[in-house]
Amino acid sequence: PLKTPKKMLPKIHLLKNEKIHKTLPKHNNSISKYDKGHVVVIGGVMSGAARIVAYASRKVGAGLSTILVKPNHLKYYTKCEPGTIIAEYSDKQLLKKDVLVIGPGLGKDYDKSFIKKIILEFDGKIIIDADAISIFENKKKEIHQLIKKKKSLILTPHRGEFKRIFKPSENKIVDCFNAS
């Protein structure tokens, strides 16, 4: 009989419960939300993005999630999901948090030096996305220094953000997409 070429085989596979349960962390019965980590999101004018991040972080295992915003942005967060803490930004609010997510829904009205200060001073794991990535546009050297300084840093640029920061040739980007 003829065999199906590998290129034609499905790239989607059924994920079964047995496999899922093997990858999930095991917790004892005495664990509480305070033991599972606290994610802080710096929110902005587009509240939906920050709210999704806060909600999703709890869904994947964080015990607590907080969205910190400027006082004039609090009005965008009046009807947040139960379980999401909304607070006015202060440096003190960043203490004892495990993960910082900065960028989703931030908007362009934040002071760039203020955002950089938050990133540089935060001691935990950091995810930089969207508008916080755009702060480093045309600052390739600065982003490289940040990557070297912060060992637990994840950048999530889309293609346009990546091009604005790193200025790769179009051929290199196409090669990466083809390789993936």
Segments (PLM) and residue ranges:
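Small-residue (G/A/S/T)-rich helix-start motifs and N-terminal tracts that mark the onset
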Residues: 1-127, 134-180
